[in-house]
Amino acid sequence: MIGYYVHHHGLGHRNRATQIARELSVPVLGFSTLECPPDWPGEWVQLPPDTTDQPEDPTANGVLHWAPLGHPGHRERMGLLADRLRTDVDLMVTDTSAEVTLLARLMGVPTVVMAMRGDRTDRTHRAAYDAATALVAPWSAETAEPYWPEEWNRKTTFTGAISRFDAPVRDAAGVGRHPLQPATPASGTDVAEPPSGVVHRESVLVVWGRGGTVVGDADIAAARAATPGWRWTVRTPDAPSPDLWRELHEATVVVTHGGNNAVAELSAARVPAVVVAQPRPHDEQLATAAALDRAGICVGLEHWPSPADWPVLLERALTLGGQRWDVWRHGDGAHRAAAALETLLRGERP
């Protein structure tokens, strides 16, 4: 059995884990503070929260990221994980937690870390990445971090982007198919070609997530005012799109943050885009935006620009177009990740 730990910040980790889990042909057991997603294909253990406003030595003198002393929720969640690692789990995936990675490895269970962009060379990340049996990176080798240690690169499977709009490679009966064969869409998800009859207008679609942002309504209003002739539509978790796949294709340019899943959805739709990094630990979104801009895939920015910059940025996004998104994705990222996990489960190298 494969164990799969899912971090609770935002929903991106859970969405990605679900896409991968649905491609597995072996049992999978999820762990998270979050509730079980409706389409999770196996058992799910909901862990008690371990947050607190007044933690005592949560980093263990700088060795760990989060292990507060005397916290009953933290002790309970680690105990629940240890119980299943002892009895059921043969391979443990973490997306992502250095502490869970090290716990599994200390219990003699092979570990796989879902890698994240940004500077992960701090003491804690370095220990987790070094200790892991393998890493899975949801981006392409062509756009990989140039500063990663070679020992990480050697044990990394670069899957390309993993999007909920990717067609599943494993059909409902669990029978594998070649990635290029037609696929049956997941329930409630349109993974077809761009809708017929779509008329592209001078429009901007802003897609913003729930993971934390420094961009407010006033910033977007100022950008809108600075770009007459462009119609702006804003979608957030509080004002979701009724059909995001269609809206992505209807938009002339899409503006979004640098979160891994948001960018994966852009890549699936192959749309001209402006990706604006939001502050994240270890400069994760800065690294994503820089990689996109460096590869000439779309406009990647370090921060939300001034209103006067928006006309030029939108025109630059149109000039770049969406033709180079294939550098970022292969179209079967979840299947590639699942295949690597099953190979490791057999004791082989992917």
Predicted regions and their residues:
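Donor nucleotide-activated moiety binding/catalytic core segment of transferases
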Residues: 77-80, 233-268
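A nucleotide-sugar donor-handling region in carbohydrate enzymes
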Residues: 131-202, 207-212
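Conserved nucleotide-sugar donor-binding subdomain of glycosyltransferases
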Residues: 61-91, 95-101
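Catalytic binding pocket for nucleotide-activated donors in carbohydrate/polymer assembly enzymes
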Residues: 263, 267-311
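C-terminal amphipathic helix plus adjacent low-complexity
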Residues: 311-350
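A conserved, positively charged/aromatic
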Residues: 113, 126-137, 248
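A short, glycine/small-residue-rich beta-strand->loop->alpha-helix junction that serves as a flexible
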Residues: 5-18, 214
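Conserved nucleotide-sugar phosphate-binding/catalytic loop shared by glycosyltransferases and other
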Residues: 7-8, 26-76
